[in-house]
């Protein structure tokens, strides 16, 4: 039998792929930008062989909510500098561009980045270019302009970002018409919503979640602010009802939206976020320890989530939500050859939530990234 020859062969003592069911020692074989074989029985030679004897080999990580941008957004950071070297091969922008600047964003970020970048286009027509907030008045929430921009060129646009938090809306501005405009844009375009719900008592969560539809994603899910997922010490009934209707829940860590007590309470009740994301943006640059997706994943492990559940929610599950099942977030033959290599550091700095609470334990750290068959 003729021996197979590959461009790249990557070996590790543990491969994990929720999409194909892999969890054990093996190798991934790559030709061009495609995975052609994976698992324990992969044999053959390759032009380049990489061995990682003490690491975990995963599909390239998928960050469903962050801020990849180059100058177009008050939050933006370069995806090829701040995501790709940290194991993230696919990242979605939460509203860095809107109808007025989507063409510039596509030209300067989506089309020029080595990282795969998707966009949840902002309902605010200027995106995140305002130095303070999205919505200064209701005219900023232009459903028709948003839908028209998607209809004109929907490439790489996953859905629509609607954020009605206190930080996104001017003081005194009613968030309800903004949410209504987002839902209108979603109906006009046939796209899902990525929603930052109101986290203030002026609009209770129980009035917001029933507005959302199957496939819509709620982000900032594990915050300790008012109107979080809990009523008292338990998951609220309306949160369970939203999940049963098909509404999805994303982490969206950021600067304000990860609390260990909230995470621990939700996990203890069996309510796991659907996707693990960083909401990484320019305030995180040069943070110590560095905020990234592997560290965010490690925090959920420390909070009690099973490791396999965490790994799936940073790879296969967000890829599926983004419509990339079989292309990203997978080690199955035929998938794009995007890989992340992580190593567990038991001596890492303590894991800290946004309120300063710490949990001891190790942390996943990035070792290597492969994007489209090329080592980064």
Residue spans for each PLM region:
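C-terminal cap of metal-dependent C-N hydrolases
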Residues: 336-376
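Active-site core of metal-dependent hydrolases
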Residues: 166-287
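Divalent metal-coordination and catalytic microenvironments
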Residues: 13, 28, 33, 54, ...
């Amino acid at each position: 039998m003729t021996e197979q020859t590959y461009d790249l062969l990557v070996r590790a003592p543990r491969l994990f792929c929720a999409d194909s069911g892999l969890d054990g020692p093996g190798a991934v074989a790559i030709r061009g930008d495609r995975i052609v074989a994976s698992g324990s029985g992969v044999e053959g030679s390759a032009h380049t062989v990489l061995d990682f004897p003490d690491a975990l080999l995963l599909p390239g990580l998928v960050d469903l909510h962050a801020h990849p941008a180059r100058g177009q957004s008050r939050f933006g950071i370069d995806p090829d500098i701040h995501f790709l070297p940290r194991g993230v091969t696919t990242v979605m922008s939460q509203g860095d561009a809107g109808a007025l600047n989507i063409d510039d964003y596509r030209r300067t970020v989506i089309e020029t980045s080595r990282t795969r970048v998707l966009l949840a286009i902002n309902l605010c027509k200027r995106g995140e270019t305002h130095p303070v907030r999205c919505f200064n008045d209701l005219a900023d929430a232009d459903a028709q302009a948003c839908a028209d921009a998607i209809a004109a060129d929907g490439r790489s646009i996953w859905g629509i970002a609607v954020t009605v938090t206190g930080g996104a809306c001017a003081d005194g501005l009613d968030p309800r018409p903004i949410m209504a405009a987002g839902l209108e844009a979603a109906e006009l375009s046939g796209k899902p919503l990525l929603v930052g719900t109101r986290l203030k008592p002026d609009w209770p969560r129980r009035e917001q979640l029933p507005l959302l539809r199957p496939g819509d994603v709620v982000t900032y899910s594990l915050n300790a602010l008012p109107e979080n997922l809990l009523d008292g010490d338990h998951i609220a009934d309306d949160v369970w009802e939203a999940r049963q209707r098909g509404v999805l829940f994303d982490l969206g860590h950021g600067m304000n939206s990860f609390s260990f007590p909230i995470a621990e309470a939700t996990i203890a009740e069996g309510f796991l976020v659907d996707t693990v994301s960083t909401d990484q943006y320019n305030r995180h640059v040069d943070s110590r320890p560095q905020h990234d997706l592997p560290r965010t994943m490690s925090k959920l492990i420390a909070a009690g989530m099973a490791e396999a559940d965490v790994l799936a929610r940073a790879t296969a599950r967000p890829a599926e939500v983004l419509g990339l099942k079989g292309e990203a977030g997978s080690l199955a033959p035929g998938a794009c050859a995007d890989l992340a290599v992580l190593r567990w550091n038991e001596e890492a700095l303590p894991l800290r939530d946004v309120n300063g609470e710490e949990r001891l334990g190790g942390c996943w750290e990035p070792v290597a990234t492969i994007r489209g068959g090329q080592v980064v």
